[in-house]
C-alpha cells in the first residue's frame, strides 16, 4: 500500500521529510506541498542544500506543479489549512511543519480539508498526544492528530527508556548542545521574548530553554516530573548532542550501562538507537537516520547511581525519518 503524504510548510523539516521519503521510504509518496513561497523558489530550495548537499534526482516546475523524478506534486500557497482540499489529492497523512498549527484546533483544519491524519513536526502546544517512534509508538490508538515531539526529545527518550527500564531513573538533568536553527540570527538583532536568542550565532554559544526533557515525561509517563533540561545553541549548521545526567534507583557500572545500550541498539530499538565506541565528532552523524546514537566513549560515572550519558542526533535528517516512520504507524 502506498501512503500518500501532504506537507504543509516546506522549511528545513518539510524539505528533509520530502528528501527522506524519496531516499528511504518507497511506500510513501508526497502528493502535495503547501508553502507561501513561489514554485520556482521551492524547487531551488529542494535542489540545493547547504547542509545535506544537492538533491539526488530531477526537479522541475510546471506551473503550480512540482515534478520530481517524473512524478507530479501539487503546489499551493494557501494561508488557511481549511482551504487546502487534501481530499482532492487523497492525502492519508499531512505533515504539519509550519510550526504554526500546533494545537488540535489548528490541525483539525487539515482534517476538515480532507486529510485523514495529521502529524505535527514539533511539540504540540496543548494536550495533543505525543509520540517518539521506538519508545511509545506502540501505544498509538488511532488518533487523527498527533505530535512527533521535538528532535531533542527523539534523542533523549530512547536512552532514558533504556536506563529507566533496567535500573530506574530517580531524577535527571539534560543539556543539549544544539546546532543553530532558523530562529538564530547571523548578527545581533531584536528578539523580544528571548533576548539572548537575538544575539548572533556566528560568534556565540547561546543558552536557551527547551521543553524536550519534560516532554519525555509525556512519552514515558513513569518519568513525569523527573527530568528537566536546557539547551546551548552553538555555531554549527546541523547535528546536536544530548548530555543526560541522572541518579539511578539501582546501582550499575558504566560498562553495564554501555552493554545494555549496545544490546538495545541491536534489538528492540534497532534503527532508532545507535551505539558507537569510536572517537566521533558531530559531522560524523550528518545524514544518520537514527535519532539517538549512544557514545560509549563520551559518558562518565561518579559512582554506581550517578552517571552521565551522551547521545548524538542529526536534528534534521534523523528526526525527519522518524516523522515518516510515524506516518506509517498512523496510516495503518
From Swiss-Prot:
Q: Which GO terms describe its cellular component?
A: cytoplasm
Which cysteines share a disulfide bond? none
**Which compartments does it reside in?**
Cytoplasm
Q: Where does D-glyceraldehyde 3-phosphate bind?
A: 150-152, 181, 210-211, 233
Top EC class of this enzyme? oxidoreductase
As recorded in UniProt, its EC number(s) are 1.2.1.12
The answer, when asked if Ion transport is one of the entry's keywords, is no
Q: Which residues bind NAD(+)?
A: 12-13, 35, 79, 121, 315
The superkingdom listed in its UniProt entry is Bacteria
Site feature: Activates thiol group during catalysis: 178
NAD as UniProt keyword: yes
Q: Which family does it belong to?
A: Belongs to the glyceraldehyde-3-phosphate dehydrogenase family.
- The protein in question is named Glyceraldehyde-3-phosphate dehydrogenase
Q: Per the UniProt entry, what species is this protein from, by scientific name?
A: Ralstonia nicotianae (strain ATCC BAA-1114 / GMI1000)
Encoding gene (name): gapA
Amino acid at each position: 500500500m502506498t501512503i500518500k503524504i501532504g506537507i504543509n510548510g516546506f522549511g528545513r523539516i518539510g524539505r528533509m521529510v520530502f528528501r527522506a521519503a524519496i531516499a528511504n521510504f518507497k511506500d510513501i509518496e508526497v502528493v502535495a506541498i503547501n508553502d507561501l513561497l513561489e514554485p520556482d523558489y521551492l524547487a531551488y530550495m529542494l535542489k540545493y542544500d547547504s547542509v545535506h548537499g544537492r538533491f539526488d534526482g530531477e526537479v522541475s516546475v510546471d506551473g503550480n506543479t512540482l515534478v520530481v523524478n517524473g512524478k507530479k506534486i501539487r503546489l499551493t500557497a494557501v494561508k488557511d489549512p481549511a482551504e487546502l482540499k487534501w481530499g482532492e489529492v487523497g492525502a492519508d497523512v499531512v505533515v504539519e511543519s509550519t510550526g504554526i498549527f500546533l494545537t488540535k484546533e489548528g490541525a483539525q483544519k487539515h482534517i476538515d480539508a480532507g486529510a485523514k491524519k495529521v502529524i505535527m513536526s514539533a511539540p504540540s502546544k496543548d494536550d495533543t498526544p505525543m509520540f517518539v517512534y521506538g519508545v511509545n509508538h506502540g501505544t498509538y490508538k488511532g488518533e487523527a492528530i498527533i505530535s512527533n515531539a521535538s528532535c531533542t526529545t527523539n534523542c533523549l527518550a530512547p536512552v532514558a527508556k533504556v536506563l529507566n527500564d533496567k535500573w530506574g531513573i530517580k531524577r535527571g538533568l539534560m543539556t543539549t548542545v544544539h546546532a543553530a536553527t532558523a530562529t538564530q540570527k547571523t548578527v545581533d538583532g531584536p528578539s523580544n521574548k528571548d533576548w539572548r536568542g537575538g544575539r548572533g550565532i556566528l560568534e556565540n554559544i547561546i543558552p536557551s530553554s527547551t521543553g524536550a526533557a519534560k516532554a519525555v515525561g509525556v512519552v514515558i509517563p513513569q518519568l513525569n516530573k523527573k527530568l528537566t533540561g536546557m539547551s546551548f545553541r552553538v555555531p554549527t549548521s546541523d547535528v546536536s548532542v544530548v548530555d543526560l545526567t541522572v541518579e539511578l534507583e539501582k546501582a550499575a557500572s558504566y560498562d553495564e550501562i554501555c552493554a545494555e545500550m549496545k544490546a538495545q541498539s541491536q534489538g528492540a530499538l534497532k534503527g532508532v538507537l545507535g551505539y558507537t565506541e569510536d572517537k566521533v565528532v558531530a559531522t560524523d552523524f550528518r545524514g544518520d537516520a537514527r535519532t539517538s546514537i549512544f557514545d560509549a566513549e563520551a559518558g562518565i560515572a561518579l559512582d554506581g547511581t550517578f552517571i552521565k550519558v551522551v547521545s548524538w542526533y542529526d536534528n534534521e535528517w534523523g528526526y525527519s525519518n522518524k516523522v515518516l516512520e510515524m506516518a506509517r504507524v498512523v496510516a495503518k
